[in-house]
């Protein structure tokens, strides 16, 4: 068993959602294997199933001026921000082939980044075992996680703040949590890191944590498989 992995670069949110949905349909039909999409989004705000527009702190006029779109989506969680310098991952995995354990799947997603941050950057990150999903450094979230599961196949996924402009999180109450902050890899290590290097590391740690080999696909190869 292997994981198909494709780095798409910067992709508009709606386009990425279309690609996810296409892969999801093929995964349900067993016509494609487990697939991990890695990408960046232009500035966008998404509202999960438990979310509220009340957690967007700026006006519609401000968002329009800044060319920031807002989408209500089917993932778990509340409000989050995506933008340049943030590595977004969409794992479309069939949980029916394992043990249909959604909590374990989220645990493994968190484990990818906990191990990566410790091994590669010497930073201690942790889960909030009692309350919230995601990966934290102290009281600050560095990886947000929100998934959806339909017919035991996952969609949506994680957002890893690499070189993200953290000021943009002031536009929202991140994940609806007023008493928590956000951080980035850049802030933790005190320097900007080459984004593609982080992509490579995340791919590697996905393989390690999920115990599978990787099938690295170019964008054209993926689109050929999807017939788009």
From Swiss-Prot:
Molecular function via GO: lipoyl(octanoyl) transferase activity
Keyword Protein biosynthesis: no
Highest rank taxon of the organism: Bacteria
UniProt cross-references to Pfam families, sorted A to Z: LplA-B_cat (PF21948)
Domain BPL/LPL catalytic, first and last residues per copy: 30-214
Family classification: Belongs to the LipB family.
UniProt cross-references to NCBIfam families, sorted A to Z: lipB, PRK14345.1
Functional note: Catalyzes the transfer of endogenously produced octanoic acid from octanoyl-acyl-carrier-protein onto the lipoyl domains of lipoate-dependent enzymes. Lipoyl-ACP can also act as a substrate although octanoyl-ACP is likely to be the physiological substrate.
Name the UniProt record assigns to this protein: Octanoyltransferase
Phylogenetic lineage: Bacteria, Bacillati, Bacillota, Bacillota incertae sedis, Caldicellulosiruptorales
Gene that specifies this protein: lipB
């Amino acid at each position: 068993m292997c994981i198909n992995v494709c780095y798409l670069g910067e992709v508009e949110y709606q386009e990425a959602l279309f690609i996810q949905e296409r892969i999801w349909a093929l995964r349900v039909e067993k016509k494609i294997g487990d697939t991990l999409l890695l990408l960046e989004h232009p500035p966008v705000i998404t509202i999960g199933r438990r979310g509220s527009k009340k957690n967007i702190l700026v006006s519609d006029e401000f968002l329009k001026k800044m060319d920031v779109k807002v989408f209500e989506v089917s993932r778990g969680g509340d409000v989050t921000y995506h933008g340049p310098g943030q590595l977004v991952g969409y794992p479309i995995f069939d949980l029916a082939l394992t043990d249909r354990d959604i909590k374990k799947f989220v645990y493994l997603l968190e484990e990818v980044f906990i191990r990566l941050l410790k091994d590669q950057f010497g930073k201690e990150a942790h889960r909030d075992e009692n309350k919230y999903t995601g990966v934290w450094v102290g009281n600050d979230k560095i990886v947000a996680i929100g998934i959806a599961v339909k017919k035991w196949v996952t969609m949506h996924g994680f957002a890893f703040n690499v070189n993200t402009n953290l000021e943009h999180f002031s536009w929202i109450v991140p994940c609806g949590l007023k008493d928590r902050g956000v951080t980035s890899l850049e802030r933790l290590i005190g320097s900007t890191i080459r984004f593609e290097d982080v992509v490579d590391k995340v791919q590697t740690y996905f393989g390690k944590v999920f115990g599978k080999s990787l099938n690295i696909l170019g964008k054209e190869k993926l689109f050929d498989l999807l017939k788009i």
